[in-house]
Amino acid sequence: DVCSSDLGGVVNIVTRGMREQGVKTYADIGYGSYNTLQTEATNRIRKGRFTSVVSGSYNRTDGHRADMGFEQYGGYAKLGYEISQAWNVRADVNVTHFNASQPGTVTNPMADADQRITRGMTSLSVENNYGRTSGALSLFYNWGRHRINDGYTVDPNDTNNPKDYRFNSRDDMMGVSWYQSARLFRGNRLTVGADYYRFGGEAWNRYVEGDRKGERSDIADKSQDEVAGYVDFRQDIGAG
C-alpha cells in the first residue's frame, strides 16, 4: 500500500470479530510523499468461548510545509468471554498519543506551535440475554492529557514573542450504567436502569523560562457528578 496524502489527525481503529476458531495476524505498511508512513499490526484469537483483538499502529508525516510534522502511536485491545449461553463479559482499552506541529498560514507563519496529546478509554461490561429478558452492567473510563505550546509568529514586526510557559490540561470521565429489560407479553417491553457519571478536568500553565520557571499557574479545576434512574414501559398498540 502507498499513501500519497499526509495524515491530518488521529487514526481510529475499527475491529471486526473473528467467526472461526484459530489465530490470525495481519500487518500493513504504507509509505508515500512527504515522508509519510502508515503501519498497523493486528492479532485476532478465537479459542472456545474466548475472543481477543490486539492492535498497534504508528503513523507519521513531515507534511507539505516546514514545521508541519505529525506522528501518532496507537494501541487497542478487546477481550471477550462467553460465560454461558446467557452471559458474557467484554473489556477493551484504546490509547492514542500524537505529536503535532502547526505552522500557521503561509502569509503569517508560526514557530514552536507544538502539541503533545494522549487520550485513552477503557470499558468493561457484563451482559445477559435470556430471550424474554436481557440487560447489562457497564463501566467505562475516558481520559486525556494535553501539553501545548501556543507558538509565536515569526514576523519581526509582530510583538507576539516566544511563550515562556506551556499550556497543560487533564480531563477524565467515568461512569457506571445498569439496565434490565423484559418482555412481559407480546408487544410489551419494560426497562429499568440507573446511571452514574463523573466528569471533569483541570488546566494550568507551566512556566519553563524566565523568573517564574518551574511555577504553575492554575486556570481551572472542576468536576461534576450525575446520577439518574429510569423506568421505561412500552406497548405496541394493536399487538395481540
Please provide the spans of the model-predicted regions.
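Face-selective signature of the C-terminal outer-membrane beta-barrel domain
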Residues: 82, 86-96, 117-240
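One face of beta-strands
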Residues: 25-27, 52-54, 102, 135, ...
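N-terminal periplasmic accessory domains that precede
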Residues: 1, 5-28, 39-42
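Short, charged, solvent-exposed linker or helix-capping segments at domain edges/interfaces
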Residues: 21-26, 89-91, 103, 149-150
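Short aromatic/hydrophobic contact patches that present stacked aromatics
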Residues: 12, 26-28, 76, 140, ...
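Exposed loop/turn and edge beta-strand positions of beta-sandwich/beta-sheet ligand-binding modules
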Residues: 7, 21-23, 37, 73, ...
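Charged DNA-binding/catalytic regions of mobile-element recombinases
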Residues: 107
